[in-house]
Amino acid sequence: AYSTVFGWQSILYPQGSYSLFNIPRTSLLADQYVINSQTGAWCKFTGQNVACWSLFNGDLYFGAQDGGVIYKADTGTSDNSADIDWKIRPAFSYFGSRGNQKIFSLCRPHFTTNGAPAFAIDLNLNFSNINPTNVPTTPTLSAAIWDTSKWDEGVWADEVTSQAWTTVFGIGECASPTIRGNTNSITLSFTAYDMIWQTGSSI
């Protein structure tokens, strides 16, 4: 059904270390499937309704489907002044004991950031694909936050590591956390996550 819609394109973006495939769904909506050229990991970009992509001086640009406006991609800390909505969904893991039931209780994502990102975690079990329902909350960070901490009193840091434990619950053989949130005016990089569980009997 999408084959007749204008906007199908692939492009290699060396500066971002990924290749991008633009998939138009309608004349106004598009998604991008992206593969990391170093690790081979895949992800999906949504909310970028793009008609075409191009490189200029190594930077990535796109033409929007609504009105022919050209934007510079992969830059800044907001989506044209709006929040950037993001979602992380790692691969399912048996956590070293395939065939055993587990009771999952806590999850801790590791972010490198210069702010305090609000996020929520929903747990997917045994290859399920649930819609996230938890409300994002902001963790407590030890470093000073711009426009919040007092000048000359806060300990300033270019980037800090957010390692807040979040309560989750589920019983299953394998699991994958869906971590989602929205950010504006801060940088954010996800590096890993930890999980706490109790191992039960084999099934």
Predicted regions and their residues:
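Beta-sheet repeat architectures centered on beta-propellers
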Residues: 1-203
